[in-house]
Amino acid sequence: MDVRRRPVKPLYTSKDASAGEPLKQQEVSSPKASDALPLPLYLTNGLFFTMFFSVMYFLLVRWREKIRNSIPLHVVTLSELLAMVSLIASVIYLLGFFGIGFVQSFVSRSNSDSWDIEDENAEQLIIEEDSRRGPCAAATTLGCVVPPPPVRKIAPMVPQQPAKVALSQTEKPSPIIMPALSEDDEEIIQSVVQGKTPSYSLESKLGDCMRAASIRKEALQRITGKSLEGLPLEGFDYSSILGQCCEMPVGYVQIPVGIAGPLLLDGREYSVPMATTEGCLVASTNRGCKAIFVSGGADSVLLRDGMTRAPVVRFTTAKRAAELKFFVEDPLNFETLSLMFNKSSRFARLQGIQCAIAGKNLYITFSCSTGDAMGMNMVSKGVQNVLDYLQSEYPDMDVIGISGNFCSDKKPAAVNWIEGRGKSVVCEAIIKEEVVKKVLKTEVAALVELNMLKNLTGSAMAGALGGFNAHASNIVSAVYLATGQDPAQNVESSHCITMMEAVNDGKDLHVSVTMPSIEVGTVGGGTQLASQSACLNLLGVKGANRDAPGSNARLLATIVAGSVLAGELSLMSAISAGQLVKSHMKYNRSIKDISK
């Protein structure tokens, strides 16, 4: 095959080949489908378009007349037969002509791409043949040296990945050496591996958080013999987490963020960010948001706003413990205790104190408002101030711990289910009958019955504590991860009871969620990270509200409850309609074998 006959190849003339200079690339047009037409392209296209629409209109009119006159459709006249032949011919032309052009564009592009990556042997062959007709035609006999052509370098479109070599079970993968490490970094890595330099001290010694994380990651790979190639390191501001979010970082985990909504809540629309790896979750919540939206929206009420902390103290006798209980619960002493509690923060305000006795041990529960912060650190500082004051009044009081688990933080507890912790919210909506049928694909009566037997009776049979719902924790966890909340507080924040009732003569559905302990904040912790801060900004609750302290956190709590309402509504409908397994098989199945 003569490679010089290809249309878009940059060739070398005898003159330029001797100088090693390529000619400009010659543009040779590829053959087109229109080249085979006897008439100009625009006339041919117009003819067949006119034929197509004309015969289509004629046939439709004729068939309508046959239907009106009760004439069988298979009885055709000569004119109808010619019209059908013309219709078929025009369809074949239009599909074939434009189809050929469409496919040919890819074929020509493929030929061009394959030409760009042609091996150098064919190119060298052309140069040698052309050079025989130039000044150095007798190069082989006269010793004339023909300079080789410049080598064209083609930049790769994507970075090449190193080939993966299969290892036997007895072999260990060699640690990955990061190319960005300098000789000084290599010495530090060896020091960390040998145990001479503590890994936790790298940030303070180096003064560079990114460099410290890079060195720590490489040292970890060498110590364990395990690769962390899939754990990204670049693209994160490690100085932003120093001393507040994470210690000894070696990278960051990527979690996809989806958007459910718009959620129409209290007359406003919200696009709810959800960080999750569970397929169907965002789609299901989004369907619930749609059902709420077209039904007029949902309404929410904030019932309570107060974070709690309950230290445990011990006396020598139960009588002395009871005396302190009566003292702190006396309304006459509340002002004094409030002054002690509130002095550590301009946002923390003591709301109330309740005590519980277990023998000679006393558990004192402090409740306070915390502004736009979630407030655990804030309330802990206030509690410490009060304990210091009480210890001066009761010298025999022994402080066992600033947290006695009577709070109760990050654990399911009846006290939070009954009394509440953080923000207590109820959210409700009335879903119209036609929405239940068209959007949720089920019936009002079926939803009410399922909710009774599943969320209420079934949960009671299981001895559930705060778990009288379908999957509130799914939505709470996803929103918490996206907005920088403490994911461990999903435990009590997901306490929820879902209620469904037929209203308006049994036609419409009243659905509500009551969540007594939603613990959220818009300042502090993970809320200051760039990604989480962006999600808070999307909801309009980023940072502290200077005009009305605490209003951003309260609004975020109602958005969480509204999102849970949407998620409950959609999942219960899927179960009622028998669509749960089908949807999860479609959207929530892993098709990648990570063991390979």
From Swiss-Prot:
Gene Ontology molecular functions: hydroxymethylglutaryl-CoA reductase (NADPH) activity
Keyword Ion transport: no
Gene Ontology BP terms: coenzyme A metabolic process; isoprenoid biosynthetic process; sterol biosynthetic process
Domain of life: Eukaryota
Segments for region (Linker): 104-183
Tissue: Expressed in flower primordia and anthers.
Localization (cell): Endoplasmic reticulum membrane
Catalytic reactions of this protein: (R)-mevalonate + 2 NADP(+) + CoA = (3S)-3-hydroxy-3-methylglutaryl-CoA + 2 NADPH + 2 H(+)
Membrane-topology descriptor: Multi-pass membrane protein
Pathway in which this enzyme or protein is active: Metabolic intermediate biosynthesis; (R)-mevalonate biosynthesis; (R)-mevalonate from acetyl-CoA: step 3/3
Glycosylation sites noted in the Swiss-Prot or TrEMBL record: 342, 455, 588
Main location group: endoplasmic reticulum
Membrane-spanning ranges: 41-61, 83-103
Induction annotation: Induced by wounding. This enhancement is greatly reduced by treatment with arachidonic acid or after inoculation with the fungal pathogen, P.infestans.
EC number: 1.1.1.34
First-level EC class: oxidoreductase
Chain spans, region Disordered: 1-29
Residues forming the catalytic site: 278 (charge relay system), 410 (charge relay system), 486 (charge relay system), 584 (proton donor)
Gene Ontology CC annotations of this record: endoplasmic reticulum membrane; peroxisomal membrane
Keywords: Endoplasmic reticulum, Glycoprotein, Isoprene biosynthesis, Membrane, NADP, Oxidoreductase, Transmembrane, Transmembrane helix
UniProt region (Catalytic), positions on chain: 184-596
NCBIfam families listed in its UniProt record: HMG_CoA_R_NADP
Family: Belongs to the HMG-CoA reductase family.
Record's function text: Catalyzes the synthesis of mevalonate. The specific precursor of all isoprenoid compounds present in plants.
Name of the protein: 3-hydroxy-3-methylglutaryl-coenzyme A reductase 1
Organism: Solanum tuberosum (Potato)
Gene: HMG1
